[in-house]
Amino acid sequence: MKKLFMKPNFFIVGGTKSATTNISYYLNEYSKVFISKLNEPYYYCRFDVPKIFERESMIRDKKKYLDLFNKATNDQAIGEATSVYLHCPHAAAEIKKDNPESKIIIVI
């Protein structure tokens, strides 16, 4: 039975131009991995990003964020890639609060 809301259990973060997007594409080729189609949703640093750097694709609403993972299944590792989580002061704490068992892959 599928859960009502699927949540990511791993995150890919890293420096600018460190290939976080490429890694997410490679991982998504495996049937046991689900990566959100939206690259860099910025959800966990939505309050840390100055207005000047906000993107149209930035997600602030929790339901919209969880909707990114609604096609994932219980037997998949579920992830997302937002490189700037590495630099956002509150991202790691927010990720831990929402997803205490999740893993963070840091690409440098």
PLM features: residue spans?
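PAPS-dependent sulfotransferase catalytic core
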Residues: 1-86, 94-107
